[in-house]
């Protein structure tokens, strides 16, 4: 099972990635984790990547793809892998294809933006303990106060409505075109000797368990 998980920030990809990982016994490959590991290990690609990161520059796609190919040679990828947060752009998807990185499924978790804004902007956090609440779905007993300590809850900057909207705008511009990219490739079939992935779209609305069952059904 070789899989790419797509969906907007706040669509619940992380939760479903954990279920898929456990069910199929495959590692979740995050480019952020991969970069940090390569830098820490001091591999040639890691040293090169560190130069860009230290200068506050984006690590070029060619270097990321090199790291991906190295990672996929490891023993835990023998039964497959799950890409989380990669590719983010058409250029990265093209680079993956040119590098011959095989993908069986592209699974999109679809949640309307209005729902994502409500989900994320309604989150409240108790900073000291990390306890989280939601003004609508999981409210504290006393509005704005932590259930255990009675201390004030905060809204993290990441969860503020304007921040969420900005993240969704970036997703719309950069990552959403991948949905069309993979959908079209699935229709065209094999290209350059690389089998086209099957494209599946599920609704990300409902309970965590309902979405999990939809995901498993889509990957049969």
UniProtKB/Swiss-Prot annotation:
Known EC number: 2.7.4.3
Residues annotated for AMP binding in this entry: 31, 36, 57-59, 85-88, 92, 156, 167
UniProtKB keywords: ATP-binding, Cytoplasm, Kinase, Nucleotide biosynthesis, Nucleotide-binding, Transferase
Catalytic activity reported: AMP + ATP = 2 ADP
Swiss-Prot/TrEMBL GO biological process terms: AMP salvage
Metabolic or biological pathway, per its Swiss-Prot or TrEMBL entry: Purine metabolism; AMP biosynthesis via salvage pathway; AMP from ADP: step 1/1
One GO molecular-function entry: ATP binding
Coiled coil: none
Name of protein: Adenylate kinase
Gene that encodes the chain: adk
